[in-house]
Structure formats: structure tokens, C-alpha cells
Amino acid sequence: MDIKLKDFEGPLDLLLHLVSKYQMDIYDVPITEVIEQYLAYVSTLQAMRLEVTGEYMVMASQLMLIKSRKLLPKVAEVTDLGDDLEQDLLSQIEEYRKFKLLGEHLEAKHQERAQYYSKAPTELIYEDAELVHDKTTIDLFLAFSNILAKKKEEFAQNHTTILRDEYKIEDMMIIVKESLIGRDQLRLQDLFKEAQNVQEIITLFLATLELIKTQELILVQEESFGDIYLMEKKEESQVPQS
């Protein structure tokens, strides 16, 4: 199963998405939390053996530098340098946000003008799997990044050696669907509770993506940073009440 990530136009686009989840002024956002989420996202792509372009890795290096500076003892010169790097990054994100808003405005105008002209039908091309720039799908990926990081830590603390099995996406799709039998929804993190190793977790996640792609499952998230639920596709789906 090929997965092609077309979610973000670059590292600043990813950072802007992470920052916007806080629903506050960019300069008030807890930058350390944003850095952790960015690094977890990139780490997850690498764990899934997906291509991570150089610009994302360069940004990851810059973020790790900012993070390390913030962890150092409060020495005046170091603190000033760390603050400069942080402010520089936030300024870049704010500038990118303005350009993106302008681009969206121009695109809307372009689409409006396009209504006055006839054009040939667009040929639809279907790929094996494509994660479109959909907020909930991106949040699914970010939530999975956190789950994977926690499970890796759990496996490391247990010090247990488990023989590696060959996991198939088709088999895991059945497991995911069976997990929903007799219930209206399933919290994403609960899906991975019994997983025994990283490969099993990743294959389960790929199976979940495939079920979403084939519209057998839908995602529900009530609010930013809230739990993500998996639900079977029905005509009317209710958001789980907490």
C-alpha cells in the first residue's frame, strides 16, 4: 500500500497547523509543546518508512536547537540567544500565515472568475492512498505520533524481547473492524492497547487509514486536542458524549 503525503506545503505549513490548534496569538503559544509535536510527527513518518524531505529535517534540527537552549540553565547570554531563535521562528510562522491567507483569498477570487468560463471536465486520477489536507486526518496522524512515542517508551521500560511477526494490513483491517463490534465508537488510543511491538502498531494504523480511505470508518473529534474516535460509517453518526 503506497501512502503519499500531500498534507503540507512545507515545514512552516505544518508548524502553522500545530500553532493554530491553540486558538491564541502566535506569540503566546507554548513553543516547547509545538516543537515536541513537530518532532513526534517527523519521527512517526520515519518509523513508517515514509520519505521525509530535507526541508523538514532542517527545520527539525532548528527546533531541537531551540528546545535544547530552553533546557539549559538560565544564563543571560544563552537565554537571549534562545529567545532570539524562538522569536525568529514565531515571526516566520506569522509571516507565513499572512501569505497563506492572501493566497487563499486570491485562489477564491480565481475560482469566482472561473465560473464565467466553460472548461473541459477534469479527469479524476485515483492513487493507492492519499492523505488529503483535511484537519481531522492530520490530527489523526498527530495523535498517532503521540501514541507511538508512548508505546515505544513502554516497550523500552518493559525490557521484553518479542519475536517479530509478519503483520499484514488486510489482517489488521479485520482486527480494527472487530474492535468496533458491539460498540458505537472506539477511542483511537484504545485500538493500540494490546499491541506488542512497534511494527504491529504501525500496521494497525495503516489498516485504519485504509478503512478511512474506503469509507468504512469515519473520524470524530469534538475539539482541538480532544480524543479522536473511530466510528463505522453510517448515515447518521453521533459524536460520543463525554
Swiss-Prot record:
Entry's Gene Ontology BP terms: cell division; chromosome segregation; DNA replication
User: Keywords assigned by UniProt?
Assistant: Cell cycle, Cell division, Chromosome partition, Cytoplasm
Regions annotated as coiled coil = none
Does the UniProt entry include the keyword tRNA processing? no
Q: What does this protein do?
A: Participates in chromosomal partition during cell division. May act via the formation of a condensin-like complex containing Smc and ScpB that pull DNA away from mid-cell into both cell halves.
Q: Which family does it belong to?
A: Belongs to the ScpA family.
Q: What is this protein called?
A: Segregation and condensation protein A
**From which organism does this entry originate?**
Streptococcus pneumoniae serotype 19F (strain G54)
